[in-house]
From Swiss-Prot:
Gene Ontology molecular function terms on file: damaged DNA binding; DNA-directed DNA polymerase activity; magnesium ion binding
PROSITE patterns associated with the record: UMUC
The keyword Iron-sulfur belongs to this UniProt entry's keyword annotation: no
PANTHER family: DNA POLYMERASE KAPPA, DNA REPAIR POLYMERASE UMUC / TRANSFERASE FAMILY MEMBER
Protein name: DNA polymerase IV
Top-level EC class: transferase
Subcellular location: Cytoplasm
Lineage: Bacteria, Pseudomonadati, Pseudomonadota, Gammaproteobacteria, Legionellales
Purpose: Poorly processive, error-prone DNA polymerase involved in untargeted mutagenesis. Copies undamaged DNA at stalled replication forks, which arise in vivo from mismatched or misaligned primer ends. These misaligned primers can be extended by PolIV. Exhibits no 3'-5' exonuclease (proofreading) activity. May be involved in translesional synthesis, in conjunction with the beta clamp from PolIII.
């Protein structure tokens, strides 16, 4: 019988913005954001909690963020500094386990099931990691401790910033009952809307549906929903995980009727993709650009082109070519990059959003 797993999700609080406030103390308690220049149609990579009170969020166009908060202080992205801090944190984590799965520069999963540190207590390990990060770098982290990755990630967000939460194995069944379905991995606004149409608001509501029904209604996502609603997630912490692509997509409440409508939503997708690339930090270089279209008959097509950088003109061309394959209304549109699978890493030059 396999032992009950002890999974920790470490998530740095407003990582880029926190570094800026640490390095420039005069910014403390002021609304700040890290991101691109509004004059160059940049996007927000992250912001501090003071800025979030104004409704500012990651991937938001900088110009819009400045409209929400005229006092917003905009800081340029200092990726080399953020990467250095991330490397220190990663080296600290390796003192507790070799089973570390980084998700980005500012968050990672740890499997400490076999760790003997802190008397084998995952709770104490998380507390010690957070304390050591703050002592050495004056940066706060939040942590979630649970029997699996999904619950650990949910828990790390529960007492942000600078807090942690434990979900014990014996408490999982009770914990998930009142959990809003929007907290589940893979449930975005569109999926939440579909679930609400079925009067599904919590995991308890979701548990009333059979796996057969959920598979019929949502395809492979139905199986995921069935398991997550019961606190089940058997995914291992994968230290060998290699990011192969970065992408964003959107399912639209009303189908996009033609290629012009698809091109009209491209700026929003591009802004979100840029923010996701910035969050990923150094990547192995771009190999391909691609677009994905799912038509209103649920048929899907993907078209890609070899490119070593983001190119808005090429993405426009790919959307037009992809749409021409069927010429039908589009219900889902996605764009992304495929990465070079090499050991050398580089920063990506992001283009201007100029359509």
């Amino acid at each position: 019988m396999n032992p009950i797993r002890k999974i920790i999700h470490i998530d740095m609080d407003c990582f880029y913005a926190a570094i800026e406030m640490r390095d420039f103390p005069e910014l403390a308690n002021k609304p700040i954001a890290v991101g691109g220049d509004a004059k160059r149609r940049g996007v927000i990579a992250t912001c501090n909690y003071a800025a979030r009170q104004f409704g500012i969020r990651s991937a938001m166009p900088t110009a819009h963020a400045l409209k929400l908060c005229r006092e917003l202080i905009l800081r340029p992205v200092r990726m080399d500094v953020y990467q250095k801090e991330s490397q220190y944190i990663r080296s600290l984590l390796t003192e507790y386990t070799d089973l570390i799965e980084p998700l980005s520069l500012d968050e990672a999963y740890l499997d400490v099931t076999e760790s003997t540190q802190c008397q084998g207590s995952a709770t104490w390990i998380a507390e010690e990691i957070r304390a050591r990060i703050y002592q050495a770098r004056q940066l706060t982290a939040s942590a979630g401790i649970a029997p699996n990755k999904s619950l650990a990630k949910i828990a790390s967000d529960w007492h942000k910033p600078n807090g942690q939460m434990v979900i014990r194995p014996e408490d999982v069944s009770a914990f998930v009952l009142d959990l809003p379905v929007r907290k589940l991995f893979g449930v975005g606004p569109k999926m939440e809307e579909k679930l609400r149409a079925l009067n599904i608001k919590t995991c308890a509501d979701l548990q009333r549906y059979s796996i057969e029904y959920l598979l019929q209604k949502f395809g492979t996502m139905g199986q995921r929903l069935y398991e997550l609603a019961r606190g089940i997630d058997n995914r291992p912490v994968n230290p060998e995980r290699i990011r192969k692509s970065i992408s964003v997509e959107e399912t639209y409440p009303k189908d996009l009727p033609n290629s012009e409508a698809c091109l009209a939503v491209l700026p929003d997708l591009m802004a979100r993709l840029e923010a996701r690339i910035q969050r990923a930090g150094k990547i192995s270089g771009i190999h391909n650009l691609f677009v994905k279209l799912k038509f209103n008959d649920f048929q899907q097509t993907t078209i890609e082109r070899v490119m070593d950088k983001l190119d808005l003109i090429v993405l426009r061309q790919l959307i037009q070519e992809g749409f021409a394959r069927r010429g039908m209304p589009v219900r889902l549109l996605g764009i992304g990059i495929k990465l070079k699978q090499e050991n050398t890493y580089q920063s990506v030059q992001l283009p201007l959003l100029d359509l």
